[in-house]
Amino acid sequence: MPSFDVVSEVDKHELTNAVDQANRELSTRFDFKGTNASFELEGYVVTQVAPSAFQLKQMLDILRGRLSARSIDVRCMDVADPLENLGGARQKVTIKQGIEQAIAKKLIAAIKASKVKVESQINGEKLRITGKKRDDLQAVIALLRKTDVDLPLQFENFRD
């Protein structure tokens, strides 16, 4: 039976490249000259360090631009509130990986409401869709692309 997986993943290498490019842009921008502003990547968490909260907002725009230039969907970003102290300001941006349980259930409910003859099941942070016809699976892909989810969805492992 044909099947495919619905995932929400970010390529670690592309993320590293985007953060490196954002750091390079910080070093060349006039409004950040002489400041200790930087991006630091640890796992899937990007930490922004700047002298003020205003500069953090500018840095977030730089990061968004670099992520989209590296074809990473910015909906995967979970931006925390900035932390300010006398030494400067910090802000953590978490890059979301995988489909959470609540969102997976919402996607399954949307698939069932469409009355397409497919089966869907949650496999950890993935969603496996199985159907008898390839056309049904393609209809589900079109449906999932239209749904309003705050995660970028990728479709992989399409088996016939």
Curated annotation (Swiss-Prot):
Entry's transmembrane regions: none
Gene3D superfamilies associated with the record: 3.30.70.860, YajQ-like, domain 2
> Which cellular component appears as one GO term in the record?
cytosol
Instruction: Print the keywords alphabetically.
Output: Nucleotide-binding
- Please list the GO terms describing molecular function: nucleotide binding
One Pfam family this sequence matches:
DUF520
* Disulfide pattern: none
Superkingdom, taxonomy of origin? Bacteria
Q: What does this protein do?
A: Nucleotide-binding protein.
Family (UniProt): Belongs to the YajQ family.
Q: What is this protein called?
A: Nucleotide-binding protein BP2916
- Provide the species name: Bordetella pertussis (strain Tohama I / ATCC BAA-589 / NCTC 13251)
